[in-house]
Structure formats: C-alpha cells, structure tokens
C-alpha cells in the first residue's frame, strides 16, 4: 500500500514538473519571438494561446472608468463607475473642467483621487453637463480585446518596438510562470529610456493562458522623460 502511494505521488510530481516545463517553454518562445520574430509570428503565436476566460491585467489608475476614441473625441466604451452612471458610448466630449476637447489639449480625466471632473458633452444632438469624482480603476482586458489588439500588429510599427536589453531566467511553478526583463526605447528628444518589467502568466491544464499581468517602472519612465511628482 505504501509503495502504491509513493508511486502515485511520484507520478503526480513528474506531471507537475512536466507541465511547468511546458509552460515555461511557451513563455520563453513568446519572448524569443518578440526579440527576433516578425510581428505576425509573435501576434499569431500569442493569439493561439489565449483562453476563452483570458484576463489581461494592465495595472491600476485614478480616473473615471471609460475608454475614449481620441480621434473623434467620443466615448468608445464605458467600463466602470463613476462613468457607468453618467456616460454612454457615442457621447461626444466637448470640454473637461473648462478645457476644450481638441487635438493637443490634455483633458484632466485623470488626477487626484476623489477630485471632481465636470464634463460637457453632446448626446443625441443635445448638450449637457455631468459631474463625477475620480475613483481607483483597474485596467483589464478580455479575450476579445486582446485578440483585437494583436490583430493591429504590422511589420512597419514592429520595427519601432522597445528593445529588450536583458532577461532574467524564466521561473515556472505548476501553472504559474514568472519573468522579468529590462527594456529600452528612444523618446522624442532622442534620449534613451530604460525600465524593468515583471510579468506573471497563469496557464490552464490545456496549456493556454488564462491570466497575464505585469508591472513596470512607470514613475522612472516618466522621470526619464522629464516629468516628476509634485511635492
């Protein structure tokens, strides 16, 4: 009996190790394609790994909880509160806190937590004003949004992607895979900007990605571009 239990445990351990090794190899392949492959090779490979219940964690921010079509200055999608209670897809933004909505103007949707945002908009031919207070938001994406983003990849833009300077060894534990790497890019002034990114992938038993999240040095990136937090 004890021999049977020992054998069962050993087989399970081998299965977990094999599964972890496969997931690790998948992430390493994605990184190799990002560094050395074409836009389509990377996008198609990633798209083939996206599970039905895929969740992309894109960080948190302070804002209103909607996505905007910057070209048309219209509301593209309402995601969270407080925007859910005040905005509708298709609303045309006219001004925000007195700042006219036009190309070149930075609209203060984001800012201090709890700060009031007064939005003048046009809906179905009628002009109106709505007031909201900024709240903590989580930026997420599902399978549809991820596949839509991957479909926009093209070889011309791919040439200008940020470059990976160095990668730490990928670490896998069962269905979870962790990786970190340093990237560099060139800003508008021609200066080199560097930052580190840490990523976490979770795979299902079929080898597809159900979760992909990352954090990076946003503050350091901003500082290298000449921005700083107010004291």
Which residues are covered by each model-predicted region?
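Hydrophobic h-region of N-terminal signal peptides that target proteins for export
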Residues: 10-18
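A beta-strand edge to alpha-helix "cap/lid" segment located at domain peripheries
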Residues: 21-22, 147-231
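Sec-dependent signal peptide recognition
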Residues: 2-8
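Conserved PDZ fold ligand-binding element
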Residues: 83-103
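PDZ-domain C-terminal substructure recognizer with occasional recognition of PDZ-binding tails
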Residues: 107-144
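Extracytoplasmic
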Residues: 70-71, 114-116, 174
